[in-house]
Amino acid sequence: MADTACLALRLLAALREEEARAVEELLRLGADPNLVLDDGAAAVHLAARASHPRALHCLRMLLRWGADPNARSAEGLTPVHVAAAWGCCGALELLLSRGGDPTLRDQDGLRPLDWALQQRHHNCARVLQELDTPTQPDETREPTETFHVAQGSFETETCQGPALAESSGVSQDSELHVHRAELEVEAVEVAVHPQSSEATENSDYSSDASFVTAVEDSLQPGRPGGALELVAGLWVTRGAVSAGKGAPNCQPQVLTLTARDTDKPVLPGDGDLGALHPHSSVPPMSDLQLLQALRALGYSPGPVTPFTRGHYLRRLQEAQASRADVGHSQELAEALRTGTIPDCQVDEEALAQCFQRLDPLKKWREGITKSSFTYLLLDPRLTKDLPARASSLTLAECLQCFVRAIFYVGKGTRARPDAHLWEAFGYHDQPRKQVCPKVRRILDIWASGRGIISLHCFQHVVAMEAYTREACLLDALGLQTLTNQKQGHYYGVVAHWPPSRRRRLGVHLLQRALLVFLAEGERELRPQDIQARG
């Protein structure tokens, strides 16, 4: 662990000096760019402040070596937050192009756009606001031809000759070649508008090949409409070389696609991406709404661009068509369908272990007193006294009923165990006041004559552990199915796990909470119960 922290500290020092060679060497030695250090941030957060070419090169290198553009600092900040807050538009565009999520909020509930507006970085704000701009409906767009490009690299080939130079306006000394360039986007669709028939008729071709040139494109701050420019840009020229004596025969094999670490030029995961603008039942939505809808279904999409929008729309349509219980994560949907719970006991032990012996001399969120817990609010109108009925139901049926009744997940303390109910009690006799969705649901249950089921789980832990367990449960359940208004915060080792692993742990924790509920029985809290306690 000491060696890991030492490497991470040396990586921070190299980034401050913008020494690209030292950064690369440390990454080769195993330095973790996502490791949150004592100051509460990781190397990728420091690199997100890149504002000129050398610093951007270091950031690009970190991302290439596995830096997470959505890694959380101790305060819940992601590199996208940092770039927006510092006004580093080039870094912001780069992070977004590598999967940075502009919808994530920090521990204060602020998005990257909120930071950009607060700090008056209008160029960054413009980039982020474009993500929430409704796009043109599919029916109004011109038909396109699409090329499907897999993650991989272009092999260099050369085709040169006098006839080519004469027909294209390129000097005889130049070469038409394809640079070897990494494509860092998982799946890209390149739309090519066909030439007009008039242009076709007036041209004499000796070959009908299309030439694709991949050019390394450095991201430029303030580029118009450049909110999500790709690092490896693709320029596509539809056309061919004029015939002439001695003209070389440039065949289509000039372009060779080679997928990384494989012999087949296939897309990772999906294969064919489908049409760029599929005709579907999905209603018109902005790019941000599309991102949020996919995240609610348990996906972790990258940025929505003109290249990827069609793919994400199709994925959303398929998910909505195939899943009756839209909103839950894939992992929870599988558990609800089969009753099979992921075996994550080892992961839960790892989560708890990292909070067992915290250094009391360091500053931790809400201290190190083990007085916190995670709680679930349930609607008794949906549980229908599940503990009494459980013996006649299967595990899958019990879990389905339990999950359907959960409407809020939170973190509480022994000092204020029912703070959420006290909040709702303050509005009990004032129905006309505007309230949040959680309070509205509580008041609705009380108005029906029933009480709230407040299930306390995973008790006697430090606040950061309770927050982490809460975040796992939220990701497994999906915000769309709850009255929670923001994602949770991860701390410790879980902060560095992939989203799918966190969601599996969330399903495991849900099943443990269900067992607590079945053992304790169903108890309702009505307004008079809250008043009596007060």
Swiss-Prot record:
PROSITE patterns: ANK_REP_REGION, ANK_REPEAT, GIY_YIG, LEM. One of its GO terms (biological process) is regulation of myeloid progenitor cell differentiation. Predominantly expressed in bone marrow, spleen, thymus, colon and ovary. Expressed also to a lesser extent in lymph nodes, liver and testis. ANK repeats lie at residues 4-35, 39-71, 75-104, 108-137. Residues 370-485 form the GIY-YIG domain. A motif (Nuclear localization signal) lies at residues 498-505. The keyword Nuclease applies. InterPro entries: ANKLE1, Ankyrin_rpt, Ankyrin_rpt-contain_sf, GIY-YIG_endonuc, LEM/LEM-like_dom_sf, LEM_dom. GO terms for cellular component: cytosol; nucleoplasm. The keyword NADP does not apply. Disruption phenotype: No visible phenotype. No defect in T cell, B cell and erythrocyte development. Normal percentage of common myeloid precursors (CMP) and common lymphoid precursors (CLP) in the bone marrow. It is found in: Cytoplasm; Nucleus. Interacts (via LEM domain) with BANF1; the interaction may favor BANF1 dimerization. This is Ankyrin repeat and LEM domain-containing protein 1. It comes from Mus musculus.
